[in-house]
Amino acid sequence: MKITKLEKKKRLYLMELDGQQTSYITEDTIVRFMLSRDKVISKEELTEIQDFAQFSYGKNLALYHLSFKARTEKEVREYLKKYDIDKNIVSQVIANLKEDKWINDGQYAYAIINTNQLSGDKGPYVLTQKLAQKGISKSTIEENLKEFDFSEVAQRVANKLLKKYEGKLPSRALQDKIIQNLTNKGFSYSDAKIAFDDLDSQVDQETTQELIFKELDKQYSKYARKYEGYELKQRLTQVLARKGYDFSDIASALREYL
């Protein structure tokens, strides 16, 4: 078979054989096989050329995808699937990129965890979920998590939450709110509790009383329409307790309020 045309078409080249059969190949393929117009090639050589062309095309696509930011093996595989590249070729591309250090799931996991350590707010459970979704193996995730102490991250998040809620919630509700937020962000309950206990979060009696009276102003008009006397007192006690106030503080406030 003779190459009768070799014409550039955007990123690929159109190779025509005997004026009929056509294939799209990469520039790397032309260089590797020293292809030119009028060159004669065998069927075996054509198969080899086509296989390498697809490999080269897949690798170029993957490198383009990786040029924007680091990706995991799973992300690159999914990207290449969109271009209908043969599975075996995809595996060859992935192996080649891993060998050349373009893909390294371990380094990817370490970088994500390290960035979170410096400026993020996620605990190990949420990070594990996110990295697993990227296709990183459980063993790789666990191996990298062991390199980090999350107590500083938990403390940083707890301090931010304290600034947000202090003076707005009673002591018990403040503790519940901060610990709940920390566990939602992926910290264990024990780590969240330690972070809260290390806070300087004393809500003084005067602040607690102010908060109770503000809440009573809102709730009294609502319940006074339906209840009175002992029943009203019970309803107000229940609603204040649900909001995190201690029964002793509630009883003291109700004696003054009612």
UniProtKB/Swiss-Prot annotation:
Alphabetized, the UniProt keywords read: Cytoplasm
Q: Which Gene3D superfamilies match?
A: Winged helix-like DNA-binding domain superfamily/Winged helix DNA-binding domain (1.10.10.10)
Q: Which Pfam families match?
A: RecX_HTH1, RecX_HTH2, RecX_HTH3
Q: Which residues form a coiled coil?
A: none
Q: Tell me yes or no: is Transmembrane helix among this UniProt entry's keywords.
A: no
Q: Which GO terms describe its cellular component?
A: cytoplasm
**GO BP:** regulation of DNA repair
Q: Where in the cell is it found?
A: Cytoplasm
**Record's family?**
Belongs to the RecX family.
What does this gene product do?
Answer: Modulates RecA activity.
Looking up NCBIfam families in the UniProt record yields: PRK14135.1
Q: What is this protein called?
A: Regulatory protein RecX
- Species name for this entry? Streptococcus pneumoniae (strain CGSP14)
